[in-house]
């Protein structure tokens, strides 16, 4: 039995190829059925995200194994093998285990240390379990990878610092306000960055979110997801005074929030402070706003300096994380190798127990017939000893006759002899 990890990711393949190798949720069951129907495959998990498509497999060794699996992947996606082969990576046993642990820990992600990948790996594992048989070693590998990812996040600072603009904006807000559970946040825009910001804020249980956007329909989809109120851009002037935090990211060529608008809001708030985070390019907030008392304005450049510092911290933490992964992968492989002896150990124990039971029954019968207890126990001990050492004795004698000192020493060691 061999463990494999094969696939493509953002480092090995352009998006034009990655999008052709994805497995959609609607067809995942069909893909797993097809994969597990391959005679060499004992169990499989398919991980498919925007940045990677990977197969994690437990397989029986055979000739041309790599060719057979590449052919299946190409046939399933109707791809030319040469197109895929140049971008495909292939990891086996210890390397496969290490790769999965690195992926689950965020060490192989586009954004180093990002936490979302662990949830994606867990979902891939859960999805592949629905009606599909797993090899026990594959299941154990995934469960171990989950615990390793948790250990990496607990014992290192890999996820402690923001390295995306959206996350940095939320981190800044949490640093300035003791708790987000008492603040109102106005989000201006409804694009991808604001979507990420809104989800981060929801996770931190912000008291109230308001989303202002040019098109109400797009904003409403996000608002329904995070429990926010939707307003139009023209309503910002009137509603700005409610916001303790404003985070803006639109594609507007001109500023949306001006100095006068913020002055009016501060006056209505009796100069309670406002945090404005402008992550738009061009800027959504007039730079002069930063000169107002109690208005704290941060631009995308301010956030970028935070991100650069934090990324350096994450890279240092990644060195510690790699050490953890190497150690855990080595321990897992030691466990896996030990499993190959499990069946032999079970058979040996069963055989010994059978001898014990057989001789015990005879001894008990002799006692019931009134035989001398001491003599019966001595006979039991003598016969049990002889039956149990018979096979090892023959093996020792044969090794000696053959002049096989290496085998003789192995047998001595296995019998606990000095």
From Swiss-Prot:
Coiled-coil residue windows: none
One term of GO molecular function: glutamyl-tRNA reductase activity
**Which residues bind substrate per the record?**
49-52, 109, 114-116, 120
Swiss-Prot/TrEMBL catalytic activity: (S)-4-amino-5-oxopentanoate + tRNA(Glu) + NADP(+) = L-glutamyl-tRNA(Glu) + NADPH + H(+)
Q: Where is the active site?
A: 50
- HAMAP family, per the entry: Glu_tRNA_reductase
Q: What else is known?
A: During catalysis, the active site Cys acts as a nucleophile attacking the alpha-carbonyl group of tRNA-bound glutamate with the formation of a thioester intermediate between enzyme and glutamate, and the concomitant release of tRNA(Glu). The thioester intermediate is finally reduced by direct hydride transfer from NADPH, to form the product GSA.
Name the UniProt record assigns to this protein: Glutamyl-tRNA reductase
Gene giving rise to this polypeptide: hemA
